[in-house]
């Protein structure tokens, strides 16, 4: 694997020994320390929107062919969903989805973007001759007012790492509840989160054991905190040891905001004899209102996307035999101090020929 992003978690054994990362008694919601909490309170929202003012992040997303071409295909191959409709593009960025909709015959598109990129989107819309069809509105969806009482279609690319990181989903649901006409559609309308297990000895050693000797100094006290940080990276499909299990499917057209916080059980069956160093989460997105169901996957056996996969390293190395099972549950919740962060509680057990263990780990995507 090649390193990319990070986040944060903690772990505790089921033998009641709890590790105190981020005040682990409330580790599903507490921050690392008081200074970090203050920084989060001051900068989290501003930093989030400011990050989308930079061209690099938009270049990465636009060059993600799986992502962008999927939306283009959905719109162009299913023009009946868009033609003569009023469309709301939530988190429009450069306005690419709005442009797709305008070209597909939308009556009007309202492109809402909170970052400074809104000004650039206006230029792009004008340069492409769609100023009469696309109106770019700069501001938060929760604060702006549309010039129309209702829209027929809401389209958004709201998904973050681990599907729910950055929590733009709540913004889409707010827009749906406020502006979507009865019988209107949300694109995409389904998103599913999955988990599997992988062998990853080389990278785990590089990420964790590295701290034992850093230029001749012992920094091993960092090891546990290092292992608590989920990694966003591309996983080789050959690393997968078990089958994959669905954690949750969310129906964006019907769900409530609170439904994005949940606990889901899982049972992973080993497909070969191997060692397990991490669990991996990924998601699929579906557009079920099309002539034929369309969508894409961010799984390790699919074409790579900028979302990659989210790797949750385990404190232990699990030795597993073909047919043995890892059972457990994953709890996912918004962080109370910064709702754009995601807190993860992972509990798992393996009762196998070579390994008998039960543990609970806490992670934070931040």
Curated annotation (Swiss-Prot):
Cited InterPro entries: Arg_MeTrfase, Methyltransf_25, PRMT_dom, SAM-dependent_MTases_sf
GO cellular component terms, semicolon-separated: cytoplasm; nucleus
Enzyme class (EC, first level): transferase
Source organism, top-level taxon: Eukaryota
Residue intervals of the SAM-dependent MTase PRMT-type domain: 45-347
First-listed, main subcellular location of the protein, grouped into a coarse class: nucleus
Family under the similarity heading: Belongs to the class I-like SAM-binding methyltransferase superfamily. Protein arginine N-methyltransferase family.
UniProt name for this protein: Probable protein arginine N-methyltransferase 1.2
């Amino acid at each position: 694997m090649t390193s990319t992003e990070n986040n944060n978690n903690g772990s505790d054994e089921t033998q009641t020994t709890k590790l105190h990362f981020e005040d682990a008694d409330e580790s599903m919601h507490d921050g690392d320390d008081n200074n970090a909490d203050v920084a989060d309170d001051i900068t989290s929202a501003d930093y989030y929107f400011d990050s989308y003012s930079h061209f690099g992040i938009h270049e990465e997303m636009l060059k993600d062919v799986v992502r962008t071409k999927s939306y283009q295909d959905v719109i162009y191959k299913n023009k009946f969903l868009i033609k003569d409709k009023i469309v709301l593009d939530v988190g429009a960025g450069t306005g690419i989805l709005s442009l797709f909709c305008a070209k597909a015959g939308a009556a009007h598109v309202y492109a809402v973007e909170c970052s400074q990129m809104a000004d650039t989107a206006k230029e792009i819309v004008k340069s492409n001759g769609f100023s009469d069809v696309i109106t770019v509105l700069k501001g938060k969806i929760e604060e702006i007012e549309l010039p129309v009482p209702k829209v027929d279609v809401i389209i958004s690319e709201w998904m973050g790492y681990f599907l729910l990181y950055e929590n733009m989903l709540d913004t889409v649901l707010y827009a749906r509840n406020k502006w979507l006409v009865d019988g209107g559609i949300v694109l995409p309308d389904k998103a599913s989160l999955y988990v599997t297990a992988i062998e990853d000895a080389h990278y785990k050693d590089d990420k964790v054991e590295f701290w034992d000797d850093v230029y001749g100094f012992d920094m091993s006290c960092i090891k546990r905190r290092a292992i608590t940080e989920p990694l966003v990276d591309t996983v080789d499909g050959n690393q997968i040891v078990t089958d994959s299990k669905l954690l949750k499917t969310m129906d964006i057209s019907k769900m409530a905001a609170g439904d994005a916080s949940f606990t889901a059980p899982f049972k992973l069956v080993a497909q070969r004899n191997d060692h397990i160093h991490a669990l991996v989460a990924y998601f699929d997105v579906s557009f079920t209102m099309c002539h034929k169901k369309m969508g894409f996957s961010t799984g390790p056996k699919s074409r790579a996307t900028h979302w990659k996969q989210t790797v949750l390293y385990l404190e232990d190395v699990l030795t597993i035999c073909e047919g043995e099972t890892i059972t457990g549950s994953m709890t996912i919740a918004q962080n109370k101090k910064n709702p754009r962060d995601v807190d993860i509680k992972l509990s798992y057990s393996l009762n196998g020929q070579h390994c008998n263990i039960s543990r609970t780990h806490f992670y934070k995507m931040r």
